[in-house]
């Protein structure tokens, strides 16, 4: 246990998910998910409805139990701990505010349960804790050895027992649940120590301390003029601030946010996005944020985990995911895209749209003559004059032009019946003939995705 903790601190990982599997009855919701989150990061779990992103959040928060795998918090497996024993807080989609309490009452609620260190701890209690830790450690080690023996014994029995028999099922069930048995004893000493300290080393907050803490957090989130208001009198944005204040006031290591901005209108949502990022950076907290909104994820996150059907397709910075998606699914899910079937050629070239183009890729990534997917983002395409000296111009005809405020989104038909989309500040008339061009680093090549339905074409 000590080694795991040391490794986690060294890596600065506050959360580590290791081979997490989650099943609801016979349905596999999470399939061997591995994820590490560093202390102070803003990490977004991004995916469509039903992808498993909220399930991951609920597992970290303790609202669901993993079927298999480990959930490590500062190096200790906590998957069997209840939510109140984890040093984190959660903001739900519906805010879960108490309607019978005013703003101040909602915010201070958690402080009534909070404990802070006593100024003076009796020496006899310190000595008693040292003796207790020794006893608890010996007990945990003894129980872990017993688990090791049982696991080896049951695994050997399964080799000879007939599948489907009562004894086989019983042994298999024990082995399937063994992660939780090990997890309990791995964190046993820490949990007993925390219980002891809460009783003898800590005290409740005084009324003066509570009032001071509430005033501080109220000012931080901009609610100083709304302390005495009823929850029913607040706008959606103000309710969001109350939920945030209530979560932050207990000083958690991690804040979990389950699509907290989805119910807000566009303008308030944009303001709250900026506000959340400012708060996170100011307090240097770890935020784990769930959303299906790609723009929101790109704007807020230090790293994004893109989730598809219970698996993490890509985990990286917003720039890396947008510019260098791992496959066609990620490319289409994140932002607008033009994706074409292509063939990788020698000398870092690609055959695309019946022409050869230079790329930044090499033969360490793809085999010569390998079929690949080629991505070109609409904003990376230039519309040029026929006479302009640009290598490998593509000729096309504009079939649609949509004004989107700061740019026009143009659909161009190519001679081989392909279509390509372009973002440009200049408008062009429908049926106008144009020439398209792009730079060498605008073409991003990806391995073919075995799970993608290429016949469907659309996302």
From Swiss-Prot:
Reactions performed catalytically: ATP + H2O + polyamine-[polyamine-binding protein]Side 1 = ADP + phosphate + polyamineSide 2 + [polyamine-binding protein]Side 1
GO CC annotation: ATP-binding cassette (ABC) transporter complex
Compartments where found: Cell membrane
Xref: InterPro entries: AAA+_ATPase (IPR003593), ABC_SmlMolc_Importer (IPR050093), ABC_transporter-like_ATP-bd (IPR003439), ABC_transporter-like_CS (IPR017871), Mo/tungstate-bd_C_term_dom (IPR008995), P-loop_NTPase (IPR027417), Transp-assoc_OB_typ2 (IPR013611)
Primary residence: membrane
Bilayer topology: Peripheral membrane protein
Record EC number: 7.6.2.11
Pfam families cross-referenced by the UniProt entry: ABC_tran (PF00005), TOBE_2 (PF08402)
EC class name: translocase
Keywords in alphabetical order: ATP-binding, Cell membrane, Membrane, Nucleotide-binding, Translocase, Transport
PROSITE patterns: ABC_TRANSPORTER_1, ABC_TRANSPORTER_2, POTA
Domain ABC transporter: 15-334
Insert as annotated region, ranges: 115-203
Function (record text): Part of the ABC transporter complex PotABCD involved in spermidine/putrescine import. Responsible for energy coupling to the transport system.
PANTHER family for this protein: SPERMIDINE/PUTRESCINE IMPORT ATP-BINDING PROTEIN POTA, SPERMIDINE_PUTRESCINE IMPORT ATP-BINDING PROTEIN POTA
SUBUNIT field: The complex is composed of two ATP-binding proteins (PotA), two transmembrane proteins (PotB and PotC) and a solute-binding protein (PotD).
Family that this chain belongs to: Belongs to the ABC transporter superfamily. Spermidine/putrescine importer (TC 3.A.1.11.1) family.
Listed name of the protein: Spermidine/putrescine import ATP-binding protein PotA
Provenance organism: Mycoplasmopsis synoviae (strain 53) (Mycoplasma synoviae)
């Amino acid at each position: 246990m000590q080694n795991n903790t040391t490794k986690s601190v060294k890596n600065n990982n506050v959360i580590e998910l290791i081979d997490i599997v989650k099943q609801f009855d016979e349905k596999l919701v999470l399939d061997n998910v591995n994820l590490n989150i560093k202390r102070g990061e803003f990490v977004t779990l991004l995916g469509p409805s039903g992808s498993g992103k909220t399930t991951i959040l609920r597992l970290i928060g303790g609202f669901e139990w993993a079927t298999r795998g480990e959930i490590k918090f500062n190096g200790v497996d906590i998957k069997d701990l209840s939510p109140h024993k984890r040093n984190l807080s959660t903001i739900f989609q519906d805010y879960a505010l108490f309607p019978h309490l005013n703003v101040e009452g909602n915010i201070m609620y958690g402080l009534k349960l909070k404990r802070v260190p006593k100024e003076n701890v009796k020496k006899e209690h310190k000595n008693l804790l040292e003796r207790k830790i020794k006893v608890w450690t010996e007990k945990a080690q003894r129980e872990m050895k017993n688990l090791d023996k049982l696991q080896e014994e049951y695994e050997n029995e399964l080799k000879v027992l007939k599948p489907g028999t009562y004894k086989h099922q019983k042994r298999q069930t024990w082995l399937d649940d063994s992660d939780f048995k090990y997890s309990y004893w791995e964190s046993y000493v820490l949990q007993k120590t925390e219980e002891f300290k809460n009783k003898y080393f800590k005290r409740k907050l005084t009324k003066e301390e509570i009032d001071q803490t509430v005033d501080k957090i109220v000012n931080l989130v901009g609610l100083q003029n709304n302390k005495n208001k009823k929850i029913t009198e607040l706008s959606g944005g103000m309710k969001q601030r109350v939920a945030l204040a209530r979560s932050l006031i207990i000083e958690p290591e991690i804040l979990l946010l389950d699509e907290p901005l989805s119910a807000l209108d566009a303008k308030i949502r944009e303001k709250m996005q900026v506000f959340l990022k400012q708060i996170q950076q100011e307090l240097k907290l770890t935020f784990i944020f769930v959303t299906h909104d790609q723009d929101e994820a790109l704007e807020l996150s230090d790293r994004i985990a893109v989730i598809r059907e219970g698996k993490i397709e890509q985990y990286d910075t917003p720039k890396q995911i947008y510019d260098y998606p791992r496959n066609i699914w990620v490319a289409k899910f994140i932002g607008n895209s033009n994706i074409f079937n292509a063939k990788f050629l020698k000398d870092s070239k690609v055959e695309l749209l019946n022409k050869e183009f230079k790329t930044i890729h090499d033969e360490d990534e793809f085999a010569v003559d390998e079929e690949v997917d080629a991505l070109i983002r609409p904003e990376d395409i230039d519309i040029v004059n026929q006479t302009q000296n640009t290598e490998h111009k593509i000729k096309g005809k504009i079939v649609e032009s949509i004004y989107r405020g700061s740019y026009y989104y143009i659909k161009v038909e190519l001679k081989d019946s392909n279509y390509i989309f372009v973002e440009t500040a200049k408008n062009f008339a429908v049926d106008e003939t144009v020439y398209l061009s792009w730079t060498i680093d605008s073409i991003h090549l990806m391995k073919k995705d075995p799970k993608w339905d290429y016949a469907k074409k659309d996302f």
